[in-house]
């Protein structure tokens, strides 16, 4: 897939290629090459797609029709414009060892950072710091929304959306300590987000969980 500023995106959570939006797809492919080298060689290197560097410094490279190596955003632009290269990504979606790397990187880049993020809220003029979001939110529905927002908005963007809703509902419920926040009505928090958010992407992600049947209990 290719959209917005991402240049090129791929995978079940749409890892993004462009550096401007985090370049998570670079890290995914680097993880694939490190942890599943044979499959990466057979599927990606075979068509000229490779990686350089590791972790946050990882970049994807590709050999163009003239044998010139493009890297980073230039590589993603070239891949985006050459539909024949899409086949490698489609094939990777059916290779278990490479699918496993999607799960690994989704957990590393989004799930754990979101659930372990420190949340600052203000209740009745008192500022409280929740050490980890997962100390307060425990239901399958709430955690699904939090992770979905972190993927779409970034962990910082997710927290900026979540904090005022927590503050509002906690004030209404008179929950004035971190321990008391564990009794918060999780569904009401996200109903507040739907009622106050201006970003349709946020609203749609919350509503999709509301409509999924996942439990807030």
Where is each model-derived feature located?
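Cell-wall polysaccharide-cleaving catalytic domain and substrate-binding groove, primarily
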Residues: 1-217
